[in-house]
């Protein structure tokens, strides 16, 4: 099975190859086989990307916003037309089940392009009356923006970052994760087909050194990263040396709080979505599931029953509900956390091992795992695992669970399940997290901002807020009378 692209990079509207760069094999996580081989960007490739972006950006920013938006909306249409093909590519790249990629990856990318393409013409500055004279503000492009992607939602992340940047009149250079480099190239082709001028969306492949080169480049005006907290800290420090704009969408250890009046099936469904979707490789996952003591026994019994029915197997089979983790290193990391959970006294209620799957013995599969009797100080309740490992914790009252939910360095997301809507609002109002749900979990419509508090990030993806993060404000004062000067 092969998925070799035409070349490693996409620059100035064309595929570009330079095999003097470091080789980067692309592995299909379900089988461990190499499906493509790309090459890391050399300094010449990086400079070519900046030259193309610089040449194109000024003319693009000068277009009417509605004209820029029209191209983004055409790109959205192209992604939807090619959704099946793109979803299969994303499954090969990430190992995620096709059942998921058909609805959550290229589809979400299309939603972002459609949203920002439609809203940009109404994103304007302010007018302030000053007693005859007046002032107004203009929202202007930053210039060349850089996006650095993660491996869990490659095409979605590429679009979530590039759509508002391009809508605002910027040029964009995107570096996908070296683990999942393929679908960003497909997005570049879709932009080209839709009529995006050459040089405005460029893709360069590579490892951390390429990311650092982009962050530190003199022409980079802004950096947007989706990744881990340690990576975010490094990139923010580098960007800070040059006072570059940054958006950071980082990790989490988010709480889901289930009160005893909650609809138990909905709460369990939300907890499963918040732990097992994308094989647990979702930054906003609610991996600390706090269940009221009156509901805990029934909740766990039914949760385990439903979890054991999850179908693990061939990701390209649409009946499969869970695929493998992205690579062997990630599986080894998750398995080590499972061992820590057992060693620290948590009860393994379900899963915890590597399933035996005919024809996929070299894949990076792992069973959906549930721990009970988890305490707040255990490693599995403190650190981001990024795999299908759920910790169930018991609580007895509202104030207690709010304090425990907030006792973390992270603040990306949170969820509350309750029949008392007033309590839902009251609790969410006290949770220190940037993206919250009441009686739902992990739904991320592009119309609203997504991002975190504390060490989970800075800035926001999506919603009108994202446009603000890809623009700068110019204030213009207009004097309608004579200048009053004491000199």
UniProtKB/Swiss-Prot annotation:
Modified residues (Cysteine sulfenic acid (-SOH)): 283
UniProt binding sites for K(+) 2: 243, 454, 457
Pathway(s) served: Amine and polyamine biosynthesis; betaine biosynthesis via choline pathway; betaine from betaine aldehyde: step 1/1
GO MF entries: betaine-aldehyde dehydrogenase (NAD+) activity; metal ion binding
Keyword list, A-Z: Metal-binding, NAD, NADP, Oxidation, Oxidoreductase, Potassium
Enzyme class name: oxidoreductase
Domain of life: Bacteria
CDD domains found in the cross-reference section: ALDH_F9_TMBADH
Residue positions of the active site: 161 (charge relay system), 249 (proton acceptor), 283 (nucleophile), 461 (charge relay system)
An example Gene Ontology biological process: glycine betaine biosynthetic process from choline
Binding locations of K(+) 1: 27, 93
Cofactor note: Binds 2 potassium ions per subunit.
Record Pfam families: Aldedh
EC numbers: 1.2.1.8
Swiss-Prot/TrEMBL cofactor(s): K(+)
Reactions listed under catalytic activity: betaine aldehyde + NAD(+) + H2O = glycine betaine + NADH + 2 H(+)
PANTHER family membership: ALDEHYDE DEHYDROGENASE-RELATED
Description of how the protein assembles with itself and partners: Dimer of dimers.
Entries under NCBIfam families matching the protein: BADH, PRK13252.1
Purpose: Involved in the biosynthesis of the osmoprotectant glycine betaine. Catalyzes the irreversible oxidation of betaine aldehyde to the corresponding acid.
Protein name, UniProt field: Betaine aldehyde dehydrogenase
């Amino acid at each position: 099975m092969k998925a070799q692209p035409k070349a490693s990079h996409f620059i100035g509207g064309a595929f570009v190859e330079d095999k003097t760069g470091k080789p980067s094999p692309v592995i299909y996580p379900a089988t461990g086989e190499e499906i493509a081989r790309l090459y890391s960007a050399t300094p010449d490739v990086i400079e070519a990307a900046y030259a193309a972006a610089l040449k194109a950006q000024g003319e693009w920013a000068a277009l009417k916003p509605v004209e820029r938006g029209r191209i983004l909306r055409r790109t959205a249409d192209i992604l939807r037309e090619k959704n099946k093909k793109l979803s299969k590519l994303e499954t090969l790249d990430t190992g995620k089940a096709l059942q998921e990629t058909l609805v959550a990856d290229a589809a979400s990318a299309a939603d972002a392009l459609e949203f920002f393409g439609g809203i940009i013409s109404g994103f304007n500055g302010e007018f302030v009356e000053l007693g005859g004279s007046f002032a107004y503000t203009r929202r202007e492009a930053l210039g060349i923006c850089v996006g650095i992607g993660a491996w869990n939602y490659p095409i979605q992340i590429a679009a979530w970052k590039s759509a508002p940047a391009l809508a605002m009149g910027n040029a964009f250079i995107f570096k996908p994760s070296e683990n999942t480099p393929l679908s960003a190239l497909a997005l570049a082709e879709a932009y080209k087909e839709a009529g995006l001028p050459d040089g405005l969306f460029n893709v360069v492949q590579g490892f951390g050194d390429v990311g650092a080169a982009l962050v530190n480049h003199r022409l980079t005006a802004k950096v947007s990263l989706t990744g881990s907290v340690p990576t975010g800290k490094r990139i923010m420090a580098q960007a800070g040396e040059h006072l570059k704009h940054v958006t950071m969408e980082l990790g989490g250890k988010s709480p889901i709080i289930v009160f005893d009046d909650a609809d138990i099936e909905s709460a369990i469904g939300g907890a499963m979505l918040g732990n097992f979707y994308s094989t647990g490789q979702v930054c906003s996952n609610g991996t600390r599931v706090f269940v009221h003591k009156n509901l805990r026994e029934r909740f766990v019994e039914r949760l385990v029953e439903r979890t054991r029915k999850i179908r693990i197997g061939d990701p390209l089979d649409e009946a499969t509900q869970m695929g493998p983790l992205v690579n062997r290193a990630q599986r080894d990391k998750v398995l080590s956390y499972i061992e820590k959970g057992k060693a620290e006294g948590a009860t393994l209620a379900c899963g915890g091992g590597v399933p035996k799957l005919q024809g996929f013995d070299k894949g990076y599969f792992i069973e959906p795992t549930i721990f009970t009797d988890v305490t707040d100080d255990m490693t599995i309740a403190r650190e981001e695992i990024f795999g299908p490992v759920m910790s169930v914790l018991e609580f007895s009252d509202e104030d207690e669970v709010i304090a425990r939910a907030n006792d973390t360095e992270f603040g990306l997301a949170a969820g509350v399940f309750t029949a008392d809507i007033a309590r839902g609002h009251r609790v969410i109002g006290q949770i220190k997290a940037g993206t919250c749900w009441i009686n739902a979990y992990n739904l991320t419509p592009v119309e609203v901002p997504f991002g975190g508090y504390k060490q989970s990030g800075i800035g926001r993806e999506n919603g009108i807020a994202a446009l603000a993060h890809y623009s700068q404000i110019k204030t213009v004062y207009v004097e309608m009378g004579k200048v009053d000067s004491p000199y």
